[in-house]
Structures are given as C-alpha cells and as structure tokens.
Regions:
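Internal alpha/beta scaffold segment
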Residues: 1-16
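Arginine residue identity/basic-tract feature
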Residues: 3, 20-21, 35, 89
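A generic alpha-helix structural signal
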Residues: 1-4, 23, 83, 96-97
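Short, conserved secondary-structure transition motifs
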Residues: 14-32
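Glycine-rich, small/acidic residue-mixed loop/short-helix segments
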Residues: 12-14, 37-114
Length: 116
C-alpha cells in the first residue's frame, strides 16, 4: 500500500463491490429481482421479442404488468435500505431493493422498483 499512496489507493472490503454494482446499475438476482419479477420490470424487456413465434412463457409475458420499473435513486439525507417504501403524494408507489452510501456521489444511493 505504500507504493499506492501517490495514486490515492486505499484498502477496502468486498462491500465496495456492492456499492459499485449499485452505481453501475448491475442487477443481482435475489436482491434486485427474483422469480416474481418479469423482465419488463427490471429493465430486461429489450431482450424479449414478443413478435416471435411461440416460446415458453410468451402467453404470460403478453399479460404481465409493465407499469413497474426499476430505477436508480440518489437520496439527499438518508442511506436507503432494502424494503424502504417510496412515497409520492402520500401514496406508496414502490420500494427499494438495495441501498448503500456512495463515496462517488457522497450520498445514499439505491435501486427501487417503482409503480409508474
């Protein structure tokens, strides 16, 4: 680490990879999405071609909710955490899947599923 001082290199933990994942918007199965989410909710809809012929799950994908979306959030005064409710005009519109303090932004960041 002595050699890295000129480059402002510091030690860190594996937790820093989680922060970078959130900053980059890289999803983690089991944290940001699970078997109850559909590809459209978590930003993977561009990989689904509903105009193709038959494929397993197509009928279900034609009827799923496309009004919930995963968004990155930046919080001014708090560090968000999993399950944090998101309000708009006193109504719950979503919840946070993951959160952390971002040294890059100097603020709390997270990913949230929000009903639009």
């Amino acid at each position: 680490m002595e050699r890295g001082k000129d480059f402002n290199i510091k030690t860190s933990s594996l937790d820093s990879m989680g922060i970078r994942r959130i900053e980059a918007g890289i999803l983690d199965y089991g944290t940001d999405m699970n078997r109850f989410n559909n590809p459209f909710e978590v930003g993977l809809g561009k990989f689904i071609d509903l105009s193709k012929g038959f494929f397993i799950g197509k009928d279900k994908l034609l009827t799923v909710n496309k009004k919930t979306k995963l968004f990155g959030i930046i919080c001014q005064n708090i560090i968000p955490f999993s399950g944090l409710k998101i309000f708009y005009k006193n109504k719950i519109v979503g919840q946070t899947t993951v959160g952390a303090f971002s040294p890059y932004f100097g603020k709390g960041i997270g990913l949230s599923l929000i009903h639009i």
